[in-house]
Amino acid sequence: MRILGIETSCDETGIAVYDDEKGLLSHELYSQVKLHADYGGVVPELASRDHVRKIIPLIEKAMEDANTQPSDIDGVAFTQGPGLVGALLVGSSVGRSLAYAWNVPAVGVHHMEGHLLAPMLEDDAPAFPFIALLVSGGHSMLVKVEGIGQYEVLGESIDDAAGEAFDKTAKLLGLDYPGGPLLAKLAEKGEAGHYKFPRPMTDRPGLDFSFSGLKTFAANTIRDADLTGDNAEQIKANIAYAFQEAVVDTLIIKCKRALKQTGMKRLVIAGGVSANTMLRSEMKALMQALKGEVFYPSLAYCTDNGAMIAYAGMQRLKAGETLALSSQAKPRWPLDTLSAI
């Protein structure tokens, strides 16, 4: 079975062709970072228009790179939600149109299920069951995963997601958009011990997250810091280090609780923030101490991409799941409402 995958939930246009025997045949990704940089964040209308401009050329390139003709495609998978409604409509409209034109089934994929299954693209894919930490700009959640579609959300952010807190704190530090990776890079120059940030919601039971207070603490710390002297950049680096350390520690504490609560020994980290070097290092140390295993997608598949959508869509198409061509995009779509396969 060979699947065309389409991802347009936010500001990346991702296209991939995946074959169940040969694996990933092609992977194209266009990021709109430069388009939105002047605005300091994603502008939904601009994102939708740029998807319209890029999606067909990227599909043609992915098909060419995969040496694949329309007659070779057995199904089309596209991100149906959650995400920006206009951006989702671009991918879903093109995906459904191609499925109709090629006379193949279409399937709508949950964006976070795509992230959750992204490590399955690797040679050392995790076996079920496992705990998944999904951390991105729009989501932070801990999920108990028994199988595809068998998801129990153990905890999630009650306000800002971890990635959103990274980006907003980076902006307060005067870093460009998207700020998360730039903050992490700045933190590499930081020194421990100069600032102590709180670890939100770790002083009480439960697995939910809250990062808005941490962002406010960072704003107050930056406001009170002397950033006019010769060592201003070092002070910023120290603040970045302390902020990142607080986020990572919080995620570590919550993951440790989830593993203890469920008795599981396998942990999957996925989503854009899973590319963070400190997070990967600390999670590896945690799982070694617990005599467990931790799994990540390759860096190319941490951010939004078509490969994860193609893979997730293939699993559902194989199970006989298809989508009516009249189906709508789902900007809001709880992960634990998906059907098990």
From Swiss-Prot:
It is an enzyme of class 2 (transferase). It catalyses: L-threonylcarbamoyladenylate + adenosine(37) in tRNA = N(6)-L-threonylcarbamoyladenosine(37) in tRNA + AMP + H(+). Its main location: cytoplasm. Keywords: Acyltransferase, Cytoplasm, Iron, Metal-binding, Transferase, tRNA processing. GO terms for biological process: tRNA threonylcarbamoyladenosine modification. Its EC number is 2.3.1.234. GO terms for cellular component: cytoplasm. Its cofactor is Fe(2+). CDD domains: ASKHA_NBD_TsaD_bac. One of its GO terms (molecular function) is iron ion binding. Coiled coil: none annotated. It holds the Pfam family TsaD. PROSITE patterns: GLYCOPROTEASE. Fe cation binds at H111, H115, D304. It is found in: Cytoplasm. Gene3D superfamilies: 3.30.420.40. Binds 1 Fe(2+) ion per subunit. Substrate binds at L134, V135, S136, G137, G138, D167, G180, N276. InterPro entries: ATPase_NBD, Gcp-like_dom, KAE1/TsaD, Peptidase_M22_CS, TsaD. Belongs to the KAE1 / TsaD family. HAMAP family: TsaD. Required for the formation of a threonylcarbamoyl group on adenosine at position 37 (t(6)A37) in tRNAs that read codons beginning with adenine. Is involved in the transfer of the threonylcarbamoyl moiety of threonylcarbamoyl-AMP (TC-AMP) to the N6 group of A37, together with TsaE and TsaB. TsaD likely plays a direct catalytic role in this reaction. This is tRNA N6-adenosine threonylcarbamoyltransferase. It comes from Alteromonas mediterranea (strain DSM 17117 / CIP 110805 / LMG 28347 / Deep ecotype). The gene is tsaD.
